[in-house]
Amino acid sequence: MTLDIARLRAETPGCAHVLHLNAAGSALPSQRTLDSTLDHLRLEAEIGGYEAAAKAHDQLEGFYPAVAQLIGADAGEIAFVENATRAWDLAFYSLDFKPGDRILTCMSEYSSNYISYLQVAKKTGAEIVVVPDDNYGQIDVGALERMIDKRTKLVSISHVPTQGGLVQPAEAVGKIANAAGVLYLLDACQSVGQLPVDVAKVGCDFLSMTGRKYLRGPRGTGFLYARAATTAGIEPIFLDNHAAKWTGDNEYTMRSDARRFENWERYFAGVIGLKVATDQANELGMEAIWARLRELSEGLRVRLSALKGITLTDLGQVKGAIVTFSVAGADHLAIKEKLRRQAINVTVSTQFSSRLDLKNRGLLNVMRASVHIYNTEAELDRFVTALDAAR
């Protein structure tokens, strides 16, 4: 399928106001997603929140098969969660770590996840083991295969890190984890919506995702994929009367599906908005979206490489829509602010979010420009010209 870029831009209100190169932070939503979210909020105001939810029952239930279609799962393996970090937390903290258990992760791991590793290690005596990178700067799957053993409780990586275009070889990692009988948690915060993800091929037990980034959904939305066979043996760290039923004075019974990871209260308008955004991704097709993002990001890398004093900092054999770079002798935060005044949105990734990777490479921070399908080649030209003038 060929994407109609002019139509996509016309259906994205923000395109008329900003040159948005921060999809990896929070992408511009479509008018359709915006309308569906606002319509439900208005309905809540007009007839009441409970009543609005009852009236929107079919839309709310439609969220689960929409997400399942996107990632190749079953609807019963999907839970709505308010963001990717909380979805990840629900999976991670529900695991029963014991002294000596090993958590295998990667150099490019996200700070929130790593802080959780540290906390669990401190409380339980589990050990954190960082698998080294290969020559491409991605996780060395050969090293992973050698390092995984009977002590390994979990393999946990970020599919696409926040600080660059690297796409980790998630399927290769999954094959190794599955062969060893080890649980596999994939942070797909930056990958789902950007590139095709099939959980059966990836082989993950859990996958966490946010709505606001490449799916172009509302903030405050996300989901957790929990493989049915894995869910059956895990009790979530939190339960309420949505995740479980109070079946006797001293008894409760959990739901049998992934919704045991949900709680009763949620952002109902956001569920509908994320469902609509997911529908749009399914309609456009992830192969077409991925092809467009690869084209734009490679075009941006070529343009940046032509500027004196610009060094690309992306790693990986396969690179995606997040483009990071450093500007010699410049204050990246000051450049970001100068661009913002021109209605050009980029951001700066720091060791705060990517300590292991950036520190290992001697980088305090890097500039990050992340494209989406609504961006154009003309916008890339404008950005590079403005960047050159801002340093």
Listing of model-derived features with the role each one plays in the protein:
Residues 1-391:
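Pyridoxal 5′-phosphate
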